[in-house]
């Protein structure tokens, strides 16, 4: 049994590993990426050259990464994929694919720092090649030095649009339009928070400087509402709409581009925590997060959580939570260490900034009005808006889970990571009700955490007779009615 096991090697996981090791606890650090740093400090392979200019504060990241590598108390599993997790009698069992071999890890002390991924909203044409998430565009730049396209529209909502636009410009691309759906004045709702988080202002100005040099001006209250493909089947242009406070379309213009990077903030990656049984809640932005106490401990003793899975808040909050989680986990296994008042004070300051983010970049329900009946909602299973409406109006679905069973929406390769949140909103809107917490939780929790080779699951996953009947019924409904 390992002493302290940490999942995720981004800002939170690296900080937790160093804090726990410094307190005297042996640490196993597991990450799915081949290199440490997470998405925020994504590093290229050695043969792809230096991508330093794609980062704002890479020095801090390299400092943490090298500190983790230098600690003899820390063992690292890079490129490791956790596909199953269970909790029983105080022991957490992780099934991990590492170097082509399945390993079973048992631990009573776990820190989950699994981060987040881009939140997407469906719209007509969003499945055309060339329509990407901002995170996807940035991953290509940071990890491989690859520019996704020469003429790029960056759109959606949230501060993450700034580094992506700046990164495209630095790589030699043209940002045709930079669009923020919300109004610029919304940050004025939290002036004191801005003043106490000067480092975040410096980061924003760092990106704005690059954007301004390219003579690019952000346009507020505008969004991409449709995409169009050319004769080769790839993206040729997008429709950009001026939208109102509730995201309803006012007027539309068409812009030529070959890449559209569109994102609406982030969704916390809570699958692993959900599989272990950690208590979850719905945040103010409608996303599911894991509940944590003042020591970053979840509802299950011995399982600690830090970073974006406790609420989207950025790298600095993730590091602050990671330090507290690492110290708390070390104390849990008997190390004589305490969380300092300064640690909690730093976390509180960064948490206030995170709360201001939610207020400044809301995603209004009016986005649903951008869709038509043929708009694809689930790209994996090619389920349209009309398919969902048929499941509700004709087949009697009364919640998103039933609609999923009737249409296979969210049952493809991504297991609902891309469409799950939108499906919950769309089904609720069609039923004229508010999305329930149960529907929100159902959209993010899954028994098999990530896709795996069938050979690995042989003999491990068993279906009851009722499971098989339900799947057969769902299959027949799909064949005959959709």
Positions of predicted regions on the chain:
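Residues forming the flavin
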Residues: 1-413, 417-482
């Amino acid at each position: 049994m390992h002493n302290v096991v940490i999942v995720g090697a981004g800002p939170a996981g690296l900080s937790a590993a160093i804090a726990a090791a410094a307190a005297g606890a042996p640490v196993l650090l597991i990450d799915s990426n081949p290199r440490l740093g997470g998405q925020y400090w994504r590093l290229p392979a050695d043969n792809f050259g230096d991508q330093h200019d794609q980062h704002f504060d890479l020095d801090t990241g390299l400092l943490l990464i090298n500190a983790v590598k230098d600690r003899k108390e820390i063992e690292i599993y890079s490129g490791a994929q956790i596909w199953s997790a269970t909790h029983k009698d105080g022991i957490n069992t992780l099934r991990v694919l590492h170097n082509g071999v399945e390993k079973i890890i048992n631990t009573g002390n776990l820190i989950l720092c699994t981060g987040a991924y881009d939140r997407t909203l469906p719209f007509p044409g969003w499945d055309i090649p060339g329509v990407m998430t901002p995170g996807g565009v940035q991953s290509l730049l940071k990890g491989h030095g690859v520019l996704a396209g020469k003429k790029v529209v960056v759109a959606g909502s949230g501060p993450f649009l700034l580094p992506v636009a700046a990164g495209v410009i630095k790589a030699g691309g043209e940002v045709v339009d930079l669009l923020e759906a919300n109004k610029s004045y919304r940050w004025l709702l939290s002036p004191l928070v801005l003043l106490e988080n000067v480092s975040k202002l410096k980061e924003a100005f760092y990106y704005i400087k690059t954007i301004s040099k390219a003579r690019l001006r952000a346009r507020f209250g505008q969004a991409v509402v449709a995409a169009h493909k050319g004769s080769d089947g790839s993206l040729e242009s997008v429709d950009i709409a001026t939208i109102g406070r509730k995201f309803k379309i006012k007027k539309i213009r068409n812009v030529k581009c070959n890449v559209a990077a569109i994102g609406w903030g982030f969704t916390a990656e809570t699958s692993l925590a959900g599989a272990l049984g950690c208590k979850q809640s719905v945040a103010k932005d409608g996303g599911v997060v894991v509940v944590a106490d003042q020591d970053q401990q979840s509802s299950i003793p011995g399982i600690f959580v830090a970073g974006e899975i406790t609420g989207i808040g950025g790298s600095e909050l993730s590091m602050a939570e990671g330090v507290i989680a690492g110290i708390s986990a070390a104390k849990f296994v008997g190390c004589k260490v305490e969380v300092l008042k300064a640690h909690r004070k730093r976390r509180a300051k960064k948490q206030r900034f995170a709360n201001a983010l939610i207020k400044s970049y809301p995603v209004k329900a009016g986005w649903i009005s951008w869709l038509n009946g043929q708009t694809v909602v689930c790209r994996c299973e090619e389920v349209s808006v009309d398919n969902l409406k048929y499941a509700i109006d004709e087949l009697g679905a009364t919640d998103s889970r039933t609609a999923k069973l009737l249409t296979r929406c969210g049952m493809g390769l991504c297991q609902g990571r891309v469409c799950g949140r939108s499906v919950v909103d769309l089904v609720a809107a069609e039923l004229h009700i508010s999305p329930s917490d149960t529907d929100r939780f159902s959209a993010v929790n899954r028994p098999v955490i990530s896709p795996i080779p069938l050979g690995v699951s042989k003999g491990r996953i068993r279906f009851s007779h009722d499971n098989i009947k339900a799947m057969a019924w769902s299959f027949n409904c799909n064949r005959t009615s959709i």
